[in-house]
């Protein structure tokens, strides 16, 4: 009988998170160490998670004893843009549970983070992974690793049957599946199989722990929170995206050059993404809206600025599977470089399992609301309708109503 898909402890170390949480955390340490934030959990499909509160709380409390060991620190020290002062801070870092509020409110699971951005930032990914795995092991207690592995090999067979050797040689795929994974063991098995047997080009994982354990590249730059926080970090709202990109450039000096475009909308982003940023950043990440239409806007923007799109890369990460990735790849091949970050469809695609649709998003920074409008109406998020309306007005974004 194959190994169980579950381990008793869900999050084993500080590196069991997405790489961009560390890159943003360094940016926060150096630029906004005093910023205060609030985050709220949302289950987008209304699933009743109340029965799992006790187990979630138990796993949450175990985060408090996690530390960085010498081997993990040595791995991070080999990453040139992670600075010594940040690594010293990380060596001392502990999860502080006083910033986490969890319980039942309005007949549903309630989870809020409130505290210094620097100390709250690492909670998001492990908390989502805990909620996902606790729910999955209650619904599917006898799941074995072999079922996830077999499903992945079926996908490889499909890809070999539908893509040419030339296409496979260029098709770049990464694991972006930490936060909504079936379990930590399943994600590790998926990453190992991708590393060893993926028929295309497996380029890395967003999970820092797996990058360390499996000797693969950690991937990620920035998330929505980086741009959202800048809505309340000093500049005028109209200048907030520019401030976020400019701060990133000053922090990383041309490294980690993939910018996220849909915090407001792609059109609003391109209005701020001038020749300076377009030359400095290596490319853009898509996370909402129709991907090929979005890519056409990016290509046209680069061409208008006199930049050859083949010197830039588009990273796609919005609810992808291998089938959709191949379609996008074919639509854009030879016009701009592309790469695909696949999450839930790699780490929680098992026959009979419905993946969760859960998010934990920043709602406030320094006591004032922040918002994500995005290129997809369902992904708009803000606790303050007036602030969303004001932001739409400032950035000339029409209402999706």
Curated annotation (Swiss-Prot):
It catalyses: nicotinate + 5-phospho-alpha-D-ribose 1-diphosphate + ATP + H2O = nicotinate beta-D-ribonucleotide + ADP + phosphate + diphosphate. One of its GO terms (molecular function) is nicotinate phosphoribosyltransferase activity. Signal peptide: none annotated. The modification Phosphohistidine is found at residue 224. It holds the Pfam family NAPRTase_N. InterPro entries: N/Namide_PRibTrfase, NAPRTase_N, Nic_PRibTrfase, Nic_PRibTrfase-Fam, Nicotinate_pribotase-like_C. Its EC number is 6.3.4.21. Transiently phosphorylated on a His residue during the reaction cycle. Phosphorylation strongly increases the affinity for substrates and increases the rate of nicotinate D-ribonucleotide production. Dephosphorylation regenerates the low-affinity form of the enzyme, leading to product release. GO terms for biological process: NAD biosynthetic process via the salvage pathway. Pathway: Cofactor biosynthesis; NAD(+) biosynthesis; nicotinate D-ribonucleotide from nicotinate: step 1/1. One of its GO terms (cellular component) is cytosol. Keywords: Ligase, Phosphoprotein, Pyridine nucleotide biosynthesis. Belongs to the NAPRTase family. Catalyzes the synthesis of beta-nicotinate D-ribonucleotide from nicotinate and 5-phospho-D-ribose 1-phosphate at the expense of ATP. NCBIfam families: NAPRTase, PRK05321.1. This is Nicotinate phosphoribosyltransferase. The lineage of its organism: Bacteria, Pseudomonadati, Pseudomonadota, Gammaproteobacteria, Pseudomonadales.
């Amino acid at each position: 009988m194959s190994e169980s898909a579950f381990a008793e402890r869900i999050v084993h170390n500080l590196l069991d998170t997405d790489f961009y949480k560390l890159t943003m955390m360094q940016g926060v340490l150096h630029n906004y160490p005093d910023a205060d934030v609030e985050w709220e959990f949302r289950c987008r499909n209304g699933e009743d998670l109340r029965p799992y509160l006790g187990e979630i709380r138990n796993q949450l409390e175990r985060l408090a004893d996690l530390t960085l060991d010498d081997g993990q620190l040595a791995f991070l020290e080999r990453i040139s843009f992670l600075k010594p002062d940040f690594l010293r801070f990380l060596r001392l870092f502990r999860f502080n549970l006083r910033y986490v509020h969890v319980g039942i409110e309005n007949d549903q699971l309630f989870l809020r983070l409130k505290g210094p951005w620097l100390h709250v930032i690492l909670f998001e990914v492990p908390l989502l992974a805990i909620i996902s795995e606790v729910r999955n092991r209650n619904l599917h207690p006898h799941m074995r690793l072999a079922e996830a592995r077999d499903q992945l090999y079926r996908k490889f067979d499909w890809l070999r049957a539908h893509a040419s050797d030339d296409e496979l040689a260029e098709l770049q795929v990464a694991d972006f599946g930490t936060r909504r994974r079936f379990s930590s063991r399943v994600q590790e098995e998926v990453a190992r199989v991708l590393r060893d047997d993926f028929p295309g080009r497996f380029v890395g994982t967003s999970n820092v722990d797996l990058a360390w354990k499996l000797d693969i590249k950690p991937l990620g730059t920035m998330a929505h929170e980086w741009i959202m926080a800048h809505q309340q970090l000093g500049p005028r709202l109209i200048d907030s995206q520019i401030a976020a990109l400019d701060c990133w450039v000053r922090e990383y000096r041309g490294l980690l050059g993939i910018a996220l475009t849909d915090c407001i909308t792609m059109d609003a982003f391109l209005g701020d993404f001038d020749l300076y940023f377009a030359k400095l950043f290596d490319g853009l990440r898509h996370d909402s809206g129709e991907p090929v239409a979005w890519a056409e806007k990016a290509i046209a923007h680069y061409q208008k600025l006199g930049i050859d799109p083949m010197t830039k890369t588009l990273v796609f990460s919005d609810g992808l599977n291998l089938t959709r990735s191949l379609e996008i790849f074919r639509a854009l091949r030879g016009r701009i470089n592309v790469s695909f970050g696949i999450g839930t469809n790699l780490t929680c695609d098992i026959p009979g399992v419905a993946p969760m649709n859960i998010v934990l998003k920043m709602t406030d920074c320094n006591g004032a609301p922040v918002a994500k409008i995005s290129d997809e109406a369902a992904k708009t998020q803000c606790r303050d309708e007036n602030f969303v309306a004001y932001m739409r007005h400032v950035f000339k974004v029409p209402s999706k109503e």
